[in-house]
A protein has these predicted regions:
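PLP-dependent amino-acid enzyme catalytic core
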Residues: 1-468
Length: 468
């Protein structure tokens, strides 16, 4: 399996290259040169697989010779041994919608499913090479905690996590900042999540800096995270009783990585009818799907902070597909975004996008009302992001018996207590291990959103860590 950049199809790379570099040197994102296909018979043969077995089948067609079969199985087994539910992913039926519980990992978010695998892949490769690596990531709340849990105490790794100051929930922040391992650095940036993402991308684009600190990343742009997320689309399809029905899946969407994994699953042969882009009032993607105009604007804070995003970092991958893999067109669109702060899809490109996706935004009032209604009718508490996915699916039209409906639950409700109290007038249930973080010491530094200041801080910490 080989990969190329969305901005240059001439150079190809191995999975190991793609995994360790995360972002292509030309600023593009890595994608496979071809998508592996599973026949309907192959898919049905996996019906009784455990999540770990299915994860191996999916990863095995993407990793090439980066890991031996025994190594890959060991990585997957170790990764999911830390989950609180032995099924890893569970389903709950509400109003004929299968709600997909993706929050049974150590930091209570869907990010754990991919991040634990990434952490163990890094450990495997770096233990063999003895090379040191510095991972830098931006988080709107959940990625950071998942990355820190997966990478803490790893021998050849440092992890630097940027989060927007005062724009993540206290639970989200404490899941990051109470981890005191010496290879973990939490940085609160004065600004928005988009500012954090911009800083990370600029560091990636600075080849001299990137090479000097051996930089890599675990944000959703890392292809391995996409592969790990493909797995649960296959898993939930095969957990339903009537597998002859095509799927409609609603995905709470911020950076477009989770829903893009669904798109790849469809290209691999999974019978997905539509993928629903569910967003809050920061509805850039809904507008783009309607008009073809991609025009980021100011981020407006919401009760669903992980979706308070205006620049979806994985959207370039779907651009590459809807432009029929014309890298020159992708470069032109991304240059327009950089220079004019927007781009316009043509009719063919917009039609290609609409062929696979629907989009619905959900207001703050609708989000809280959905949490309230589901709790009153089913005694189950949705987190705000999952509530947006649930409501977006309802907005897509009346549910037909011809399809199977799924809503991805991306986080545990206890991570967003203020929103839950606003909706149902009571605190969400909280696992015991989460209660303990509120009495633990925190460690983080606050920095201005200045690239040079940030780079200087990271270089100093890398130097101190190397000498110590």
């Amino acid at each position: 399996m080989l990969y190329f950049s969305t901005r240059d199809k001439q150079r190809t790379f191995s999975f190991k290259d793609v995994f360790l570099n995360a972002l292509a040197s030309d600023g593009g994102l890595y994608v496979p040169t071809s998508i592996p296909k599973f026949s309907p018979e192959k898919i049905q043969s996996m019906k009784n697989y455990t999540f770990q077995e299915m994860s191996y089948e999916i990863f095995n067609v993407f990793v090439g010779d980066a890991f031996s079969p025994e190594e890959l199985k060991g990585i997957i087994s170790k990764s999911y041994s830390v989950f609180r539910n032995e099924k890893i992913v569970d389903l709950k039926l509400i109003d004929n919608i299968s709600c997909v519980e993706l929050f049974h990992g150590p930091t209570l978010a869907f990010k754990d499913i991919a991040m634990q695998v990434l952490g163990n892949m890094y450990e495997n490769l770096l233990n063999k090479s003895k090379n040191k690596m510095n991972l830098i990531t931006a988080t709107s709340g959940d990625t950071g905690a998942a990355a820190i849990d997966a990478l803490k105490s790893k021998k050849y790794l440092n992890i630097f996590v940027l989060h927007p100051e005062n724009k993540v929930s206290e639970t989200q922040r404490r899941l990051m900042t109470t981890v005191l391992d010496k290879n973990v650095y939490n940085i609160a940036i004065k600004g928005t999540f988009d500012d954090c993402q911009y800083l990370v991308k600029e560091m990636f684009n600075d080849q001299k800096f990137r090479n000097s600190i051996q930089m890599s990343g675990v944000n959703s742009i890392n292809w391995a995270r996409i592969v790990a997320q493909i797995v649960y689309y296959f898993f939930i399809y095969l957990r339903q009783k009537e597998t002859e029905k095509r799927m409609i899946v609603s995905v709470p969407t911020g950076n477009f990585g989770d829903i893009y994994a669904g798109y790849i699953a469809k290209q691999m042969g999974l019978p997905i009818e539509k993928l629903i882009i569910a967003s809050n009032h920061n509805n850039l993607l809904e507008k783009c799907l309607s008009t073809g105009l991609y025009q980021p604007s100011k981020v407006n804070p919401s009760v669903s902070p992980s979706m308070d995003i205006q620049v979806a970092s994985n959207f370039e991958r779907i651009l590459f597909e809807i432009c029929n893999q014309d890298e020159s067109r992708v470069v032109a669109l991304m240059n327009n975004l950089k220079n004019k702060k927007e781009f316009q899809l043509n009719k063919t490109e917009l039609s290609n996008l609409q062929e696979n996706f629907l989009a619905h935004s959900v207001s703050e009032e609708e989000t809280l009302q959905t949490i309230k209604e589901v709790y009153q009718e089913h005694n189950f508490v949705l987190d705000p992001h999952s509530a947006i996915g649930f409501k977006a699916l309802k907005k897509s039209g009346s549910l037909s018996d011809n399809f199977s409906y799924f809503c991805l639950e991306t986080a545990h409700a206890c991570k967003f207590p203020d929103a839950i109290v606003s909706a149902i007038d009571k605190e969400p249930p909280m696992p015991d291990f989460v209660k303990k973080i509120f009495s633990k010491e925190e460690s983080f530094i606050v920095l201005d959103g200045n690239l040079e200041i940030l780079k200087s801080y990271i270089e100093k910490k890398v130097s101190n860590n190397s000498s110590g």
